[in-house]
Structures are given as structure tokens and as C-alpha cells.
Design a protein with these regions (language model features):
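Histidine/acidic residue-rich metal-binding segments in metalloenzymes
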Residues: 118-129, 154-261
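Acidic, glycine-rich active-site loops and adjacent beta-strand->loop/helix elements
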Residues: 46-49, 73-76, 230-231, 260
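Di-metal (Zn2+ and/or Mg2+/Mn2+) metal-binding site signature of metallo-dependent hydrolases
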Residues: 34-57
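Structured core elements
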Residues: 7, 42, 69, 132-136, ...
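Histidine-rich, glycine-flanked metal-binding segment
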Residues: 1-39
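Short coil/turn connectors at secondary-structure junctions
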Residues: 23-26, 32, 36-38, 63-66, ...
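Short low-complexity, flexible loop/linker segments enriched in glycine and/or proline
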Residues: 29, 82-93, 194-199, 240-242
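Divalent-metal coordination cores built from histidine and acidic residues
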Residues: 53-179, 217
Length: 261
């Protein structure tokens, strides 16, 4: 750390040093005893639901965070509640993964009034957000949207369904989403019958599906957020192989939770 003056004009630092001349400055802030630092960028959060009740995210901002990434680990609200009359995906997917009471999740789902990725971004624009919010497209919800909840955890997608997933991802990247989030942690289970013994939909995706989706990301210079299948060395290696520039001709921007307890 250094003790010095900082001159700012039009939102940019134009000078810094000891005892700057501030005679013509419009405003002088005495920051003696305080720290001046860049805003923190929190790249892995699960604030999707919290934004709906406390969009200012004061507990995050007060620590110096100015930007957050949401919809990590394949879970998010990009497609709305996705209720089908029987299944309640927000409740089932979030309850055990995020340890949130089902009653709270149900109330959140009741208040969702959008049904697609574009309308979700428009919804976020109506909130009085504290930090900047960056959104990933959640893979579990993408599978549910294309295949239906029950099928998303019982079978592979057809060629047509996989192509539709790729098209939705490509469109979403074009309107402001920065990437795709997936998950492979073995303790992320669903919370509603008859699927309580099954993990969230993203974990049913085979290598072929992930390869197709990550190709879209690579072509668009977008980001793949992932957690590796920690119980399988082979599957973990295959996961990281998808990021290889040598194999695929171009590097893939990736953020991976690689250190696990």
C-alpha cells in the first residue's frame, strides 16, 4: 500500500502522487486513514433469489464488491418459474443445493412473471441493483426448458433438443449473457418427489452434450463456469480437455471450482 493523492476526472484516474495540487479541483475528499482500492469482482455467487428481495445486496457491497456473477452451478431464473403443473423446478433445484426453505423458494417462484432469458434481463433492469450484475445461462434450467423437468433427469436429449439448446445459448449470448454454467458436484440433489434421489439436471449431460454447448461458447468467446466431477479422475480430465486450445483449435474461457474439500 501507498499513501498518496489521486486525481480523478470524468471517472478516470489522471494523476497520482504525493501532495498533488488540488487548487482547481471541484471536490476534495479527505480519505486519511482509509483505503482506496478497485471494486471487487465476485465471479461465483448464488444471489439469483436474493436479488428479488434485496437487490441492493448490501452485505456484498459493504465489503467492496462492485460486480457479481449470478446463475452459477447451472441454477438460475433465466427461464422463469418453469412450473409445469406438477414440478416446481426452482423449489426442487435450489432447496438442497442452497439450503433454502421450500416455503421461501415457493414464494419467490410465485412472484416470477417472466418466461425467457430476454425478459429476465429486462426484469433485472427494473431492480434497484447495488452492484453490477453479470448473468450466466444456467444449464440445469436450459435442460428443463428444452426437455421438460422429468425427462431432464431421466434421459439424454435428442439431436433436435440438443440443437435447440445450442440455439438458445447462442441467442442468449447475443443479448447479454456472458456464458453457460454447469455443475458436477455429487452432493447437489433435487428436493422433490419422485426425484429426491437424483442430482440436478446438468449432471445428466454426457460428454457429447457438453462438447456441443462449449463449442458455442468457444465460438462466441464466452465463459464456461463449471465444477468438476470430483469422484472421477477420468471425467475430470475429460472436463478440462474441453477447455484445451490444442485439441479444439481455440482456448475456452473457463472458471472452474478446482479446489474441493
Amino acid at each position: 500500500p501507498r499513501i498518496e493523492d489521486v486525481a480523478i476526472a470524468k471517472g478516470k484516474i489522471i494523476d497520482r502522487g504525493q501532495d498533488l495540487n488540488y487548487t482547481n479541483a471541484e471536490k476534495v475528499i479527505d480519505a486519511k486513514g482509509l483505503w482506496l482500492m478497485p471494486g471487487l469482482f465476485d465471479i461465483h455467487t448464488h444471489y439469483d433469489l436474493e436479488l428479488e428481495v434485496a437487490p441492493a445486496l448490501p452485505e456484498s457491497v459493504r465489503h467492496g464488491t462492485t460486480s457479481v456473477v449470478i446463475a452459477n452451478c447451472s441454477l438460475g431464473l433465466a427461464f422463469g418459474s418453469q412450473r409445469d403443473g406438477i414440478n416446481d423446478p426452482i423449489v426442487s433445484c435450489y432447496a438442497r443445493v442452497e439450503n433454502i426453505p421450500k416455503s421461501v423458494l415457493k414464494n419467490c417462484a410465485d412472484n416470477v412473471d417472466w418466461e425467457n432469458p430476454k425478459d429476465y434481463l429486462n426484469h433485472l433492469d427494473t431492480l434497484k441493483l447495488g452492484p453490477n450484475v453479470v448473468v450466466l445461462l444456467p444449464h440445469s434450467m436450459l435442460r428443463i426448458e428444452v426437455m421438460g423437468f422429468d425427462d431432464s433427469v431421466t434421459r439424454d436429449p435428442t439431436d433436435i433438443e440438443l440443437e435447440k439448446m445450442c440455439n438458445i445459448l447462442q441467442h442468449s449470448l447475443g443479448i447479454g449473457y456472458v456464458g453457460l454454467s454447469t455443475d458436477a458436484l455429487p452432493f447437489h440433489y433435487l428436493a422433490a418427489h419422485p426425484h429426491c434421489e437424483k442430482t440436478i439436471p446438468t449432471q445428466f449431460a454426457k460428454y457429447r452434450e457438453l462438447k456441443k454447448l462449449t463449442k458455442v461458447l468457444r465460438d462466441k468467446n464466452a465463459v464456461w463456469q463449471a465444477t468438476p466431477p470430483k469422484d472421477s479422475v477420468i471425467d475430470t480430465l475429460k472436463t478440462f480437455l474441453l477447455t484445451s486450445a490444442r485439441v479444439h483449435g481455440k482456448a475456452l474461457k473457463t472458471t472452474v471450482v478446482s479446489a474441493l474439500d
